[in-house]
C-alpha cells in the first residue's frame, strides 16, 4: 500500500435513519420502519446506508401487505435524490410534471413524516463536505422540509490527519525537470485508493513544512472563544504562553440558525485586497474578516512568533491563525456560524495564504485563492523556464518570492535557480485541498503573476481531482484586462456557483477550466511536464 494508517476513524452522525409512518391514505395501517442503530444491527447485521435503505423498503412493503415487487429502487429516477446536496423535500411537493406525488414504493420520500426524523444538533448542520470519503451529502433539515437521512459515516471534522500517518524520510533534493508525481509516496510506491490519499496528502504537507513554510503547530493546549457585538476573540494557550486576537463577523446567523461563512484575509469580500466584491451580492452567508497582521505581520514579530519562535514563514502562521478561528467558532455557537460550511479567500500574498489555509486545514469546505502568483497556485519550474526564455525576471522568481514578506523559511531561497531539485512543485500544494472544493481565480494581465506557470499549475492540479472522482469540485478560471485584485465581472459566475453549491447546498455547474475576456487559452502540453499516469483511485 505504501502509506500506513495508524488507526481509522469511522464516526457515525447522531442523526440516524428515520422513516415516517406509512400514511398514503387515512385508512391505511401504519408501519414504523426500523430507525435505531441497535434495530438496524439486530435486523440487518450492520449500521449503514444500505441497511437503512433496506429497512425503508421493508417498511413500505409491509405496509402494502408485501405485494409490491422487490425490483423497485429506493430513489426514483424521475425524482431528485433527497440526499442530493441542496434539495430539501416538502411534504406534498409536486413532481416535475406538476402532478401531486403519491406515497408509494417509487416515491418513498413522499411517505416520510417530519415528526419521525431524528434531527441533528440545531447549532450546526450535520452534513459533510461534498466528495469527502465514504459518505453522502445530507441537506440540513428545517421545520418546513423533510429529508430521509440514512446513517452514514460522519465527516472527520478535524484539522488534519497527520497523527494517523507515518511520514517517511523527506528528501531535500531531487533531479527532476518534470513535475513531481503527486501519487508517489515517500517510499516510492504509488497510491491506488482514495483512502491512501489521506496519508499521501499528509506526506506532501510534511514536505512543505520542512522545506518551504516551516512547521504549523498543531493541537494547542487550549483555544477559547468569546463573542460580543460582532467580534469573536480567540485566546490560545500553549506551552505556558498565551496570546489573543479578534476577527469581525457580519451578517451572522444565530445559535439556532447558523449561517455558512466566508473567511476573508484583510477584508476578503468586504473590501481590500482580495475582495470578491459584487460577486457575493444576494448570497446569504456570514463574512468573517481576519487581519493576518494580528497574528504574524510581515515586518516580523506578532502573536504567533511569541508563542512559537521556530523560524516559520508568515504564510504558515496565517494558516495557523485561521485554524484557531475555526477552533473558537466550534466552541462559540452564539456567533451564529455553521462551521461545517466555511470558505476561505484572499488575493495576492493573501491568495498564497488562502491556498495554504485550504491545504493545511480540512475543515475548510471551499478555498478561493485569487491571483496568488509565485508561492501560490503557480509552478516554480515553469516560471523559471519562462524567465530563462525572456532573459529576465518576467515572472516573480523563487528568490524574490522566497524573501518578500518573510512568507517562507529563510533556507527556501537556496532553491533559486535550482527549481528542478525541488521534491515538489505547486500543483502538489494545490492538490492537498482535494477532494474539497477549490476555485482558483487568476489574472492574465499581470506579468509578474505568471500567466503560463499559473495556467499550467491549474491544469496539472486538475489531475488529482480527476483521480479522486472529484472533478466537479475544481475550477481554474483565468481572465485579463483588469487591475490586480479587482475581480472582473467575467468571473462572477464561477464565484456564485461555487458558493451556492458548496456553502448553500444549491445546484450549480462547477468543474471546468475557464478562459474568459482578454485572455487566450494557453497551449498546455501535458507531455512536456508530466511523465506519470493519472490513476483512477478506487
Feature roles, as predicted:
Residues 369-429, 450-458, 464-471:
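Mobile cap/lid helix-loop segments that gate and shape the active-site cleft of serine hydrolases
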Residues 263-333, 373-385:
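Cap/lid segment of the alpha/beta-hydrolase catalytic domain
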Residues 257-262, 282-287, 339-341, 362-366, ...:
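Loop/turn elements at helix/coil->beta-strand transitions in domains of secreted/extracellular proteins
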Residues 270-272, 295-297, 351-353, 374-379, ...:
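Flexible loop/turn segments at secondary-structure boundaries
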Residues 325-390, 418-419:
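Primarily recognizes the serine-hydrolase "nucleophile elbow" in alpha/beta-hydrolase
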Residues 149-246, 251-257, 434-438, 443-538:
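Alpha/beta-hydrolase-fold serine-hydrolase catalytic core, especially in secreted/extracellular enzymes
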Residues 7-8, 14, 20-104, 111-122, ...:
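Bacterial Sec-dependent N-terminal signal peptides
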Residues 1-7:
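N-terminal secretory signal peptides that target proteins for export/translocation
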Amino acid at each position: 500500500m505504501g502509506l500506513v494508517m495508524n488507526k481509522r476513524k469511522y464516526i457515525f452522525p447522531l442523526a440516524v435513519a428515520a422513516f415516517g409512518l406509512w400514511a398514503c391514505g387515512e385508512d391505511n395501517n401504519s408501519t414504523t420502519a426500523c430507525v435505531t442503530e441497535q434495530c438496524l444491527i439486530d435486523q440487518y447485521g450492520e449500521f449503514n446506508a444500505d441497511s437503512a435503505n433496506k429497512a425503508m423498503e421493508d417498511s413500505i412493503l409491509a405496509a402494502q401487505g408485501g405485494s409490491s415487487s422487490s425490483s423497485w429502487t429506493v430513489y426514483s429516477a424521475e425524482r431528485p435524490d433527497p440526499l442530493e446536496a441542496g434539495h430539501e423535500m416538502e411534504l406534498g411537493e409536486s413532481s416535475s410534471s406538476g402532478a401531486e406525488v403519491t406515497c408509494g414504493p417509487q416515491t418513498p420520500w413522499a411517505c416520510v413524516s417530519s415528526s419521525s426524523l431524528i434531527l441533528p444538533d440545531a447549532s450546526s448542520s450535520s452534513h459533510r463536505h461534498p466528495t469527502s470519503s465514504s459518505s453522502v451529502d445530507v441537506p440540513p433539515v428545517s421545520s418546513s422540509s423533510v429529508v430521509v437521512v440514512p446513517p452514514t459515516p460522519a465527516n472527520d471534522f478535524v484539522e488534519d490527519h497527520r497523527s494517523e500517518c507515518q511520514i517517511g524520510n523527506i528528501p531535500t533534493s531531487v533531479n527532476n525537470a518534470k513535475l513531481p508525481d503527486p501519487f508517489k509516496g515517500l517510499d516510492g510506491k504509488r497510491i491506488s485508493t482514495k483512502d491512501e490519499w489521506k496519508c499521501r496528502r499528509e506526506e506532501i504537507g510534511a514536505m512543505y513544512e520542512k522545506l518551504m513554510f516551516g512547521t504549523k503547530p498543531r493541537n494547542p493546549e487550549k483555544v477559547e472563544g468569546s463573542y460580543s457585538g460582532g467580534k469573536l476573540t480567540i485566546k490560545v494557550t500553549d506551552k505556558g504562553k498565551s496570546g489573543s486576537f479578534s476577527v469581525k463577523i457580519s451578517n451572522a446567523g444565530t445559535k439556532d440558525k447558523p449561517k455558512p461563512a466566508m473567511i476573508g484575509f484583510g477584508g476578503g469580500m468586504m473590501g481590500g485586497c482580495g475582495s470578491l466584491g459584487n460577486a457575493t451580492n444576494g448570497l446569504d452567508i456570514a463574512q468573517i474578516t481576519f487581519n493576518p497582521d494580528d497574528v504574524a505581520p510581515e515586518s516580523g514579530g506578532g502573536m504567533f512568533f511569541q508563542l512559537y519562535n521556530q523560524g516559520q514563514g508568515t504564510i504558515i502562521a496565517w494558516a495557523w491563525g485561521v485554524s484557531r478561528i475555526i477552533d473558537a467558532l466550534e466552541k462559540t455557537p452564539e456567533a451564529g456560524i455553521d462551521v461545517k460550511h466555511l470558505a476561505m479567500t484572499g488575493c495576492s500574498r493573501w491568495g498564497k495564504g488562502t491556498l495554504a489555509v485550504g491545504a493545511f486545514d480540512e475543515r475548510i469546505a471551499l478555498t478561493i485563492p485569487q491571483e496568488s502568483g509565485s508561492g501560490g497556485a503557480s509552478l516554480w519550474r515553469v516560471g523559471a523556464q519562462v524567465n530563462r526564455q525572456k532573459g529576465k525576471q518576467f515572472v516573480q522568481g523563487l528568490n524574490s518570492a522566497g524573501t518578500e514578506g518573510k512568507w517562507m523559511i529563510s533556507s527556501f531561497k537556496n532553491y533559486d535557480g535550482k527549481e528542478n531539485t525541488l521534491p515538489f512543485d505547486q500543483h502538489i500544494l494545490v492538490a492537498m485541498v482535494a477532494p474539497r472544493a477549490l476555485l482558483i481565480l487568476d489574472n492574465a494581465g499581470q506579468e509578474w503573476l505568471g500567466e503560463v506557470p499559473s495556467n499550467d499549475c491549474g491544469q496539472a492540479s486538475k489531475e488529482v481531482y480527476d483521480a479522486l472522482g472529484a472533478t466537479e469540485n475544481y475550477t481554474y478560471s483565468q481572465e485579463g484586462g483588469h487591475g490586480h485584485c479587482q475581480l472582473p465581472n467575467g468571473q462572477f459566475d464561477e464565484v456564485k456557483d461555487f458558493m451556492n453549491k458548496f456553502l448553500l447546498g444549491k445546484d450549480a455547474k462547477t468543474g471546468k477550466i475557464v478562459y474568459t475576456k482578454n485572455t487566450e487559452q494557453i497551449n498546455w502540453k501535458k507531455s512536456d511536464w508530466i511523465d506519470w499516469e493519472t490513476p483512477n483511485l478506487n
